[in-house]
Amino acid sequence: MQSMTSSGASATTEQQGRVPLFSTDAAAPDGLTPAEQERYQRDGWLGVYPLLTPEGVSYTCQVRERVVRGFMAPEWLARSRDAKDLELRPWFKSMHAYVPTFYDITCHPAIVNRMVSILGPDVIAWGATLLRAPVGTTHRWHVDVEHRHWDGVSVFLGLENIEPRSTLKVISGSQRMPEPPQAYGIIHDDAQALTAVRAQVPESEIVPVPVRPGEFFIFAGRMWHGSHNSATLPRIAMIIHYSRPDAHIRVPTNWDAPINWHPARPPCVLVAGEDRAGVNRLVERPAGGRQA
């Protein structure tokens, strides 16, 4: 049984003394209020909350630029068959396990304490990636492959060029749908997605979440979400995934059924409580390697 180490609790410090990464407004509450818990159960998302300073946003984007090519991109996964492949070039959703800055963001109490209210006292971060959405890019309505196979909660942290035309969109209440959007085919059209959800959740609405750079929101892993960057600049955001330690975390190599799974065991970080299950590979804060 592994317990959370002090390194995970030290995330509020300035990043290596160089940059004030976290905003003084990034409160570390005891957890969600009763009203927030009720809203999460109803709507499936919460926020927005402050986290990073403007300098922290800029620094985080600089780190991404330096390290992103060292990770295995989605299009390469389909060609990977050997567990050793992800030792040489880690999964693109394992950035928090290799980059200290991303680890510290993932472990920040402003996020983790809220996760504990949703998931319980024991929480792991199993995925974190920084995505760049070029102008005109559409990410179809979907539920992440992983959260179709195990329960969890995600965080969307806005970094660069986040505005109403580029932010992530969610459909409120859609986490209660028995099927993900993928069961309805490839859906890019907002009206089509909303019609499908309203057939079972009549009060649902499409919400372009009003995140600004350095702010984050929380959403249920099974919530329908998508985006279309119709702004004039590329968007950069960080996506973080959390689950209970007894979830068996795996790496998918494709997006649509039937799902194929990579033989490698991805690294996970215990951000709260204890690992009472022992089914995942847990790692400590990275000291070097793909660092910044």
Label for each model-derived stretch:
Residues 2-25, 74-77, 216, 223-292:
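Non-heme Fe(II)/2-oxoglutarate
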Residues 2-43, 49-143, 148, 255, ...:
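Non-heme Fe(II)-dependent double-stranded beta-helix
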Residues 19-20, 163-224:
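Double-stranded beta-helix
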Residues 129-132, 143-145, 157-161, 170-172, ...:
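Short, structured patches in soluble enzyme cores that scaffold and shape functional sites
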Residues 133-135, 173-178, 241-247:
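Short edge-strand/loop segments of extracellular domains
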Residues 137-143, 152, 166-171, 179-183, ...:
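A short secondary-structure junction signal
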Residues 143-144, 192-202, 253-259:
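Short, surface-exposed loop/helix-turn segments at secondary-structure junctions
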Residues 148-164, 187, 210-211, 218, ...:
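Short, conserved beta-strand element in jelly-roll/cupin
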